[in-house]
């Protein structure tokens, strides 16, 4: 719930379902620690128990994500094979890739597939597997097996959280898929907006020093920037885009 809190009656009206159904579903979410029910109001709780859905994430830090994409596109060369993960940050790249054609794009993300399937000069390799609706992507053993048979010039990804200068996600399936892409790519690029340094998740993927480039947005704190550079991270600060950052 993007509003943070909502009356239970509003949920029933919005989705045209019974109050009994709403209460049953909210009870399950409350049991999982994702919200609190009190006096007819459901309130979302901050949580690292699950990955957020792409529908929610796509609207979060949209300006910063576009800033990161504009910086990342300069690291792609025509003729390359490029892995793209299922993050909403990397999805900002899809509208920019035509300028780098011809390219081969390999992805497990349904939204990226839909964006690029008719773009001239883009050869698209779609990875199948078990479909996960919350992130609009395919993951699982079938997906990682297919990835292991491929080799790419570049892998571009984002992450749910950065703790102790390590990328973290809350889903083991996400970790397995991204690590497989990471391992078969010659160059690895991480896109991370400033909010990722304030979040936590369960499963570690890679240290930031393992990436060839870590791109952060202009609102990243000077303390984070200085610390990362002091550790030898190949850090790029995306320039502020006029008209995008308030």
Predicted regions and their residues:
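Conserved phosphate- and dinucleotide-binding cores of soluble alpha/beta proteins
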Residues: 2-10, 16, 31, 111-246
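HTH-adjacent hinge/linker in prokaryotic transcriptional regulators
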Residues: 1-83, 87-88, 94-102, 106, ...
